[in-house]
Amino acid sequence: LIAWLIWSEVCFVLFYVPLSWAVDYLPGWLISATWQLTIIFGVLTTPLVKVTRPNGQKQALKIPLASLPWMLVILLGVLLTVAAFLYHLQHITPMLLAIGAIMFGAVAYPLGNRKIMAVVEPSMTATEKVLAMLLCSYPVWLLIAGLSYHQVGLPHMGQVINTFVVALSSGVIATVLFFKATQLAHNMRELAAVEATQSMEVVFSVLLSLMFLGHALPTPSQLLGLTLMVGGIIMLAIRE
């Protein structure tokens, strides 16, 4: 129970709170781009996952050395995208803090997920896993809600509707499907392929930001960084 309480907070609370704070300072597509670092951190936390061999013994997965070059390509893409965005800004301190918050969440999410995978019962479904983690983290969410009410009062109806849509699409549908896919992965390549699907988040974020939020098209340098990042993630997933 203690492990469930601790790692549920790490996976959910320490993931959503930093990202929610970063939204006030960075455009959505840049948050999605920086968030792709979670794929690198996910690979680095792979040894925390243990799989059951045919002989019944549990063995920790290993970090494949073949993934390191593509991880560097992903990192280069993220750095180029972020640097191109910050280049024309005069006050970059809040932006750097927001990027740091995203990186913190990018570590917390795969770390919490890996540690929960180590203690979850094989018979537990992805939906049951998400529900259990939500219940374990709920006291902290109530505390955060209480502090927010004390400082700014009740949210507007528009905020409630937007939060409901995000919670349903990202917090329920996407999380359950993602956790189900990670449970089906039996080796590092399959696990990396599952996590690589998150790269499409960048493409959708750019397109939807242009369509609905009126954001400017990323600069050529930023587009190059995004291309390197998505390409590195895809190659990481399909490597031999």
Language-model regions: role of each:
Residues V43-P47, K62-F85, P220-E240:
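Hydrophobic transmembrane alpha-helices of multi-pass small-molecule transport proteins
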Residues L1, A83-A108, H150-V165, P218-T227:
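Juxtamembrane helix-entry segments on the extracytoplasmic side of multipass membrane proteins
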